[in-house]
């Protein structure tokens, strides 16, 4: 597995933060690094496999990667990212309490993926632009200023995650996307789901395609296939059981869709493990 080292990304040993833009981000194999990373999705779509678990990416996704996590990007489609790198929550010279504004693992569950709205993305652009420039010197005042901008960015993201579930259409669409991520195996009737999230059906179709590059049904099928691939790799369930557990009503149809998506059948994938 590829290991990325801070010495290759930070401008100096005293620099607390580094910015790496990916415009676009191509597929990148599984890796980990000796620093922390905040991945901010500005445009496009893709799949982020985080510690073996697949997450679909779209504009407004924010991913928090620790120094012991492993992750990769695949199936990228004009995926534009900004990566904010920092050494560790407790590695700043003038900041304390950074961990308060980061995801916290609870009972073995780490909420690594947040979502913010377009307004927050616009608000943080100037902060990211400031962080792109290394501190003017190693003087304490320059380091302190640089760290203070990072804290502003972190607080903006934290506030954006707390408030993005607003009652406007964008907020309700984000709620719907999160619901699909967590309930992909359930039978979905799009008119009923549109009513549930108070979205006109036409608006749901249009906005979801704008956010993900896929029709609603294609997006749901993709979620199910990604989860099925994860179970094929990490569980002992049979192919048939996995098909039903992931929301497919017919295992043969599941195998056909799986081969079309990943260029190999479920059984071929499992035989390679």
Curated annotation (Swiss-Prot):
Residues 174-272 form the HTH araC/xylS-type domain. One of its GO terms (cellular component) is cytoplasm. Residues 191-212, 239-262 bind DNA. GO terms for biological process: positive regulation of DNA-templated transcription; rhamnose metabolic process. It holds the Pfam family HTH_18. It is found in: Cytoplasm. GO terms for molecular function: DNA-binding transcription factor activity; sequence-specific DNA binding. Keywords: Activator, Cytoplasm, DNA-binding, Repeat, Rhamnose metabolism, Transcription, Transcription regulation. Its main location: cytoplasm. InterPro entries: AraC-bd, AraC_XylS_family_regulators, Homeodomain-like_sf, HTH-like, HTH_AraC, HTH_AraC-typ_CS, RhaR_RhaS-like_N, RmlC-like_jellyroll. The record marks 241, 250 as: Interaction with sigma-70. PANTHER family: HTH-TYPE TRANSCRIPTIONAL ACTIVATOR RHAS (PTHR46796:SF13), HTH-TYPE TRANSCRIPTIONAL ACTIVATOR RHAS-RELATED (PTHR46796). Binds DNA as a dimer. Activates expression of the rhaBAD and rhaT operons. This is HTH-type transcriptional activator RhaS. It comes from Yersinia pestis bv. Antiqua (strain Angola). The gene is rhaS.
